[in-house]
Structure formats: C-alpha cells, structure tokens
Amino acid sequence: MVAAIAAVVAVAALIVALTNARPAATPSVPTYTAAQTAAAQRQLCDTYKLVARAVHFDTNGNNPAFARIALTNAAAMLDSVETDPALDGRHRDAARALAAAYRTLTAKSSSDAFAEVEYRAALGDVNAKEAAMNEVCADGG
C-alpha cells in the first residue's frame, strides 16, 4: 500500500514538473551601436595602414631579418585589434586571414627550408589578403 501511494505521489510530482517546465533562457547576444562598430573598424583599419607601411618598407629592403620582424609584428598587431567584439565579421575575417598569411610568409621565407615555389605561393597569398584588407578599409574603416 505504501509503495502504491509513493508511486502516485511520484507520478503527480512528475506531471507538475513537466507542466511547469519553462524553456531555458537563451543567452543574449550583445549588440553594439553603429558608433561602436565604426570605431572598431576605424581602429582595425588604422592599424592595418600602419603595419602595411612597415611590411612594404621592410620586405622590399635587403635585410631578410627586418622583413620577418615586420611580418611577425604586423600579424600580432592585427590579432590584437581583430578581437574587438564590436568589429563586424567582414573586417574581422579579413584581418584574421591577412595575419595568417603574414605568419605563413614569415615561416616560408627561410630559403633553406622551403622551395622558391612555396615562398612565391605564400607571397601571392599575402598580396591577395592585402587586397581584401584594402577593400574593407577603402572607406576609412
């Protein structure tokens, strides 16, 4: 008899729990104002313009060490600004792709470790990613 009462109480508790169940609250996605997004884009593009000048100057010189340093610093600087949560996906993706291309070119610029064709492919990828970055930053941000 006690087991039957316990079973009825358990079933009743289950019915109450199921009928009162509420869907889990979905986490809110932060939203940013147009001004915040524009500021993040401007910061990224200002950083890109700075690193592009350094990369252009140092990779066209006669010191491979300076070229590698410029590429590595450029990738790190782009990484630091592309993490701004107010930055839109188009700008973030372009910055991430360019930073990765800079790192790959740095690695493949060692003439003893990679063939010329691999270096040229990495250089071509940098040029393509820079063109994409120029496009997203064409209007100042």
Language-model-detected regions and their locations in the chain:
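Active-site proximal helix/loop that lines the substrate pocket
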Residues: 103
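Alpha-helical segments in soluble extracytoplasmic regions
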Residues: 32-93, 106, 125-127, 131-134
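Hydrophobic single-pass membrane-targeting/anchoring helices
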Residues: 1-27
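Extracellularly exposed regions in secreted/surface proteins, prominently low-complexity, repeat-rich
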Residues: 110, 114-141
